[in-house]
Amino acid sequence: HIMQPLFDEKTMEVHKKHLQDRTNVRSPLATNEVGFDPRTGFPNNFIGGHVTMKPVIASHFNYRASLIRQMEWHGIRWRALPSESRDLYLHFRSLDLSAVDRIMLDCYSARGPKPRQPSCMLRSLLIMVATKCPTIPQWVETLHVSPFYALLSGFDPDDVPGVGTFYDFLDRLWALSTPNFSSHIKPPYKRELKKPKEKGAKAASVEKESVADLIVRLSTTVFSANQEAYGLMFQIFRTCFVNESIRRGLVRPDRLCIAGDGTPVVTAARFRSHHTCDCWKKGIFNCNCNRFFPQPDCDIGWDSSREHWYFGYDLYLLTDADSQLPLFPALHQASKHDSHGFCEAFFRFRALAPDLKPASLLLDSAHDSMAMYKLCQREGITPYIDLNLGNTKKTTDYHGVTLGPDGIPVCPAGLKMKSNGNDLNRQYAKFRCPLNNNGTCTCEHPCSDAKYGRTCSIAMETNIRLYTSPPRPSDEWKLMYNKRTASERVNKQIKLDYMLEACKHHCTKYLVCPRLSYHDADPPFQMEGPVIHMTVA
């Protein structure tokens, strides 16, 4: 509904005729494109004795003032707009993107044609995502048809940027010289696809490097925002959105609880490649020569939710579990295992946002490995990771006590013993008789002379993966782990509500575009509309 023109054809003709009658009068937005310094009287872009073509750093107050004057100039009353357009107006009128002009100042040359304001370009892309417009050409057409969207973006309706201008802006956000992470020319893709045996299970890892070796390698790697492909975009995301959420009390850095999860991103229906040799002319069709891959960063992965193979990416997202707001996205190949995807995202997030140190970590059973617990122990993080019984031996023996695959002792009657908390001073996990009823053992064949039944204490250092603090079966652990579903809700919102999979681009650069996540919240003070939090997907 909000993609329809705000005026009918007759009203638009009257509107255009009214503007033609005032051709000699410049609109308020046009007269405020370049401000003047009140001390010198020169324009703000008059630097070093000449006029520079770098973007003018404008404040959010100037944008709001120009927006109000422009809407009055064009006869648009925001209270008379449809409810969807009115919500957009309230959201983006309060969204401060003035820091984008300062951050991207070095991305523009001092010579050449005058550029568009980076804050207006980014705001227009965010409005495009909010209105679920799938492509940039369709969005440019919408800006020409509906003046409201042009005004809300910060443009003059008679001077709307073209399609190439938007793609040029996306090129400036991308730090690499190539549009993809890898080369188009690769050896032929030959991998045996093995479907998981259990329903809902994830595919086995195809990584040649173990999680422990990957953690060691990433720990010694230096990550810089200037070297990362999306480093500039994350700097904008951190400055304009994450810091604003921290200021409003939605994200609390002192007790940050991070939930991580990966989600499939489908980009094509099938895997495609082209021959770069002439072996087919000789009758050789299955040669081992290099192939040309249109989407070199994509491959085949397993979607455990829909239970089918897909071609595309794997989006791994670190989410604040308390506020259900995204913190850091990472885009990998579809075959990337979640444990490796987490390590890639975690170490980059730690390097690009060193002041945001997580206090707890919520992960599913795909991340269950001893190396992950040792990483959390070294970083001072409390892990809440679901146990993967496939990574544990069936039965073990600990000083005459039989342990199950989940590390819980099993009494001679074949019953699992109940957790009795942890002794943190002595670093012991305590267990008691499962038939203990109000301090009395009700077992018909007690295995201990004690009145309250048999007890068992196991050193937590024996296996920090099995004996966690708080204990895995406890109510405290379960209550905390239930917050992990926040990452799944955010993934769903990015993919479905904001149409991430609708971006059918053949390169990673144009897929890495701003995506919005709207979350209703009750901040400690009054604000206009829901909180806006952006993810770079």
Language-model segment annotations:
Residues 168-360, 365-378, 386-388:
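Polybasic low-complexity intrinsically disordered regions
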Residues 477-537:
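Basic, amphipathic alpha-helical segments enriched in Lys/Arg and hydrophobic/aromatic residues
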Residues 35-121, 126-130, 151, 157, ...:
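Dynamic "connector" segments at or just before major functional cores
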Residues 19-22:
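Short hydrophobic targeting helices and cationic amphipathic motifs
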Residues 138-153:
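DNA-recognition alpha helix
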Residues 374-491:
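Helix-centered, glycine/charged polyanion-binding patches within enzymatic domains
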